[in-house]
Amino acid sequence: MPATYPEYPSSLSYSAMEAQIREFWIERNIFRKSLEKDAPKGIYSFYEGPPTVNGKPGVHHLFSRTIKDVVCRYHTMQGYQVPRKAGWDTHGLPVEISVEKKLGLKNKSHVEEYGVGEFNREARALVYHHIDDNREGWGKLTERMGYWVDMDSPYITCDNNYIESVWWALKTIFDKGLIYKDYKIVPQDPKSETVLSSHELALGYKEVQDPSVYIKFRLKDSGESILVWTTTPWTLISNVALAVGRDIDYVRVKHRETGEVLILAESRLSVLVEKIGDESAWEVIDRCKGSDLEGRDYEPLFNYFSPERRAWYVVCGDFVSTGEGTGIVHIAPAFGADDYELSKQYQLPMLQPVARNGCFTAEVPDYEGMFFKDADKPIMQRLKEEGKLYRRETIQHTYPFSWRYDVPVIYYARESWYIRTTDIAPRMVALNKTINWNPPEIGTGRFGNWLEENKDWALSRERFWGTPLPVWVAEDFAIGDGPDSGKLFAVGSVAELREGFIEIDGEEMNLGDALDKGLVELDLHKPFVDRIWFIRDGKRFNRTPELIDVWFDSGSMPFAQLHYPFENKELFDKTFPADFIAEGVDQTRGWFYTLHAIATLIFDRPAYRNVVVNGHILDKSGQKMSKSKGNVVDPFESMEQYGADAIRWYLMITSPPWRPKLFNAAEIEEEQRKFFRAFINSYNFFVLYANVDGFRYEEADIPFTQRSELDRWVLSSLNTLIAEVTSRMEQYDLTGACRLIGDFTVDDLSNWYIRRSRKRFWKGEMGPDKLSAYQTLSTVLETLAKLMAPFVPFIAEKIWLDLKSVGGTSKAESVHLADWPVADESCIDAALEERMKKAQIITSLVRTMREKAGIKVRQPLRRILLAAAEPGSRAAYELVSDIIKEEVNVQKIEYVEDEDGSVISKKAKPNFKTLGPRFGKDMKLLAEEIRIMSHKQISRLEKEGSIEIDLGGRICTVLREDVDIVHEDIEGWLVAADDAHRIMVALDTEITEELEMLGLARELVSRIQTLRKESGLEITDRIALTIAGSEKLLAAARKSESYIMDETLATSIVLLPLDDSQPGDGVEQVNNELCRLSLEKSGS
């Protein structure tokens, strides 16, 4: 064990220190030990959401992972076992896109030509390359930031065992009759040509500008036109009908000059007005109901199609409204959900001249190969040239984009498999109410509303690399056939799959036999599973070719990571539901939803009990980070520059996690200077004197009751801190806990306890008081290291290890293996804390007033006045009066009850923000009454929290929050107040000649102490001092000679008039008086 505690340089490199601690954790296997240590409270279950295996970690991941790490470290210290299994999301488009780029494949058809088997082999190789070689990506971020998660045995969504568990879940849902195939209008990603689920769709909305056009459809039986509005001109090619509201009032209007007649909803006549003053251009010539228009034929806009079914006539739809447009909707069944449902009612034809890649087909040669959104402009131009375009505008609205390819989504009629989540929506809503959401409004609002508006889950995907949908169908299967039809079934395990058949070298054989003989290797992916068929009741069943939504993969991780139900049943029962999860706000419609939906579908339980949602990270100006803006923050560069601890602390303390976070380097540096420097300086202060005195905490504890009031106060405050931080952590209020620790470290420990205890450490002998000071400060530092450990694991570990290297009371190998501190109620003295808090507040107020007046703290002043109108307030102040006088450097404290305001003047100002909503039109009259409130009325309002004001016979109750109370300075005095703690203080700013002399002496001491430090003297070294100065300065020195010698450890002082012959540094000014100081180490 070293003989001395290590000291930290003022230029401590946080990055280098963190590297040292990481090495310690690895060498000692500390993370593994934290998982294996005694856990008397059992398992605290945490689920890690799987990142995309080939994704790049960003600063937002540092944010979410800090939250996870803080909570998990805290519960480990609280006596729980907290398994933390990492995971990899390995299926779907992110991997496929990378493989396509590597192989030079441009689209889906290219992949099919290349070969699905070879393509998926490349995908698997890519996945495991990233898993095995992640030191520069996720692994580097995880280790560098101090995030403890088990990356040695992660769950991998493309693993056979994982897929088997997913298949079990799908079969369970299928057997409940909740998986079905249907033909619907679905949102589709045209780039990948695959369906998007509602939760995927929610991830990609953007603000865009689209055309807003009014089109004239000419009726066949007259020269009149029906006016229709649309924001999707490209769909007009597929128009087959116009829908009106059966009971909506429509009008025929005639243009007074041209004679043109248009038909539209009467309540939408305003759309005809192109310019101000055009109202009179049109006149109403007839009115009718929408039902009167039903069945009328019109001329198609384009002549590309000759459908067998009747088309291009007016129909009635109950979805038609007059909230926008013209009250008439153009119907293109292939591209709209309402349109499609209406087409089934009227047997309308479906014109679908757009391929799944979003491009027009050869059916419309004028636009063949053109992307659907790119066709808007040429179509509008054509309609304008043909006289069919009435007006063109631009509209700004939100529109969904592919969350992976960033291209506009197309709503498209196609077959797809669905999970009937609408059947369980009420149950999902009910279970959601049992979850503790942080913040609550996410659970009741964004997430709750999403559940209320639930749509069936579009499950299937027509891609290549993913979990195959384990449904086998007969050749005569058709949409509408259910599990009881005998035409389809689901496979839920490898054992069931082994019952199928496979062809090998032209020979058909049982799959189980083939596997047992080593003729094939099991791979639950395409194309292997597509080779397997079943024979049941004489029918052949082949697998439906689709994959499933990758979000089902990640939502299955609570059980699939354990290969449940095939093994680990007992462990699953202990870890489900999760006690805690945390991710970004965008996951409310992503992972949070899929976890919740699958858990409800299978287990009828929520998947998690507590969730912390983090907001987005923005740049320092509040802008979204993007490569194009050049404002993306590199997490590795930031951690190298500031250290991971500083960024973790900054992300936690600035605001609650769910609020948008501005990443501001200047604020990170400020937290380093404020909090980290206070903690390190407190440690350095301790070891500076402990090394001199050889303190190792080997002596018996000084009893708490025998310690000084200052020691008892800081220990009481420390135990109150433990209780309050623990309470905040149990409520998942991480920011509140962080701020409590920060305030205690800076305000109570560094700026108060240590500063007021300095003289006790300077004492030569190790008496009971000095020993008590050492033991108290050592205890505070050790306890703070524990409280800080979840938030700033590196610096907490560093100080813990360095304290433990010489002395201390804890034997834990690491602070992260130590137990969380428990508040000792017997040490808490609320009254002592309260009066010391008053002393701190008064000190702060007086120092602020000194700064305002330009008077240094070292300049003594005569007195302060404290308002003591409340019962018992004077007695409380008198208990800490000596401390206050010493801190603010005044000679005395006087007390006033000041009910009439003769000494301390108060004024009341109305708070319109609270008055307005409560008093409405009476607010102005009430504000005038508030402005003329007397001092006594204001004091009563402060004491009682409310006051009644007669407003012309009407009694109004004014609350404390309705009034801003300001305190006005009086001549020769400055006044300040802290309303929250009901403290008001006035400072006498007059400086007499006697006070000025005392101020000179104090300033001299400060300069001498600086010179001692610059001369390289030890803190215990005695000195011989020479002061040369002006007569006024020497007079001040003579008057305070004993004080100067005691403070500077001087054994002698020589006072000389100033001339150029004296040794020492150059002449300087001390409070405008010339002075030259010199000192040398004294032998005695």
From Swiss-Prot:
UniProt GO cellular component terms: cytoplasm
Reaction catalysis annotation: tRNA(Ile) + L-isoleucine + ATP = L-isoleucyl-tRNA(Ile) + AMP + diphosphate
Any single biological process term in GO: isoleucyl-tRNA aminoacylation
CDD domains: Anticodon_Ia_Ile_ABEc, IleRS_core
Residues annotated for ATP binding in this entry: 627
Enzyme class: ligase
Cofactor(s) required for function per UniProt: Zn(2+)
Function: Catalyzes the attachment of isoleucine to tRNA(Ile). As IleRS can inadvertently accommodate and process structurally similar amino acids such as valine, to avoid such errors it has two additional distinct tRNA(Ile)-dependent editing activities. One activity is designated as 'pretransfer' editing and involves the hydrolysis of activated Val-AMP. The other activity is designated 'posttransfer' editing and involves deacylation of mischarged Val-tRNA(Ile).
Name this protein carries in UniProt: Isoleucine--tRNA ligase
Lineage, top ranks: Bacteria, Pseudomonadati, Chlorobiota, Chlorobiia, Chlorobiales
